[in-house]
């Protein structure tokens, strides 16, 4: 399977979740969720990180762009679901390290994972508040020493991608950026109901619940224009 370039951002057009999970089982690298915002506004540094690793289709915009390029069977794989499917498949085979959220959020996330997946090997975790270069170095040293198989980083883009690449230089593993997935998993943030997700309308649901997101959603108008004009 070949990567597809969308405005210089390379995306793997997976046709099933199983294909991506099989990739996780046989490769190492950073999994980056690709949506319209990343396609339009990725910095050169972020674009290089994505293209050296694995971009997968997380948003409806990215999925439509792939279909427009002829990959009719490409599917959207939401990152907030993918990390749990990775755990469900590999929780007895691989070790995990979690980074992100407030201290109470990461502790609740770890506790819930241990209840939901008895026997899961959580090699370590810490909150996402890194306040100094020394703390950053200590975290990287810790992960390199523990050598987990999978590292989840929930800090939002581009912070999480930059941190994952730094850790990757010291320790090869599967990395996945999760944004606010720990908040969703612990029930602090409500995800859009299934109907909205299935009909590629999750962005509209979020906008209704959080009107302050309107500035972030404006890029969707530009993205739709680009799709219409075949500029991707």
What spans do the regions from the language model cover?
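Short gly/pro/ser/thr-enriched loop/turn and capping motifs at secondary-structure boundaries
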Residues: 62-64, 159, 181-186
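A transmembrane-helix-recognition feature enriched in membrane-embedded lipid enzymes
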Residues: 63-68, 191-232
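Short, well-ordered alpha-helical microsegments
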Residues: 40-42, 106-107, 159-164
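N-terminal nucleotide/polyanion-binding subdomain common to many enzyme families
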Residues: 1-75, 81
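Proline-aspartate-enriched helix->loop->beta-strand connector
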Residues: 143, 147-157
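Conserved beta-alpha
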Residues: 63-142, 146
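Short hydrophobic/aromatic-enriched beta-strand-loop microsegments
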Residues: 55-57, 74-76, 119-125, 171-179
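Short, flexible loop segments at boundaries between secondary-structure elements
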Residues: 127-131, 173-209
């Amino acid at each position: 399977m070949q990567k597809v370039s969308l405005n210089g951002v390379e995306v793997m057009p997976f046709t099933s979740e199983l294909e991506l999970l099989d990739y996780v089982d046989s490769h190492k690298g950073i999994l980056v969720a690709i949506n319209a915002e990343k396609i339009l506004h990725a910095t050169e540094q972020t674009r290089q990180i994505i293209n050296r690793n694995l971009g997968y289709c997380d948003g409806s915009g990215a999925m439509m762009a792939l279909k427009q390029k002829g990959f009719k069977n490409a599917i959207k794989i939401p990152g907030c679901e993918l990390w749990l499917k990775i755990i469900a498949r590999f929780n007895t085979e691989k070790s995990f390290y979690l980074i992100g959220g407030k201290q109470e959020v990461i502790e609740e996330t770890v506790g819930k994972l241990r209840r939901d997946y008895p026997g899961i090997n959580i090699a370590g975790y810490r909150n996402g508040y890194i306040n100094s270069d020394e703390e950053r170095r200590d975290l990287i040293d810790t992960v390199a020493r523990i050598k987990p198989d999978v590292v989840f980083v929930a800090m939002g883009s581009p912070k999480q991608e930059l941190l994952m690449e730094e850790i990757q230089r010291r320790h090869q593993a599967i990395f996945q950026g999760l944004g606010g997935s720990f908040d969703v998993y612990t029930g602090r943030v409500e995800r859009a109901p299934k109907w909205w997700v299935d009909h590629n309308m999750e962005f509209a649901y979020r906008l209704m619940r959080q009107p302050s997101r309107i500035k972030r959603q404006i890029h969707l108008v530009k993205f739709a224009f680009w799709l219409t004009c075949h500029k991707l």
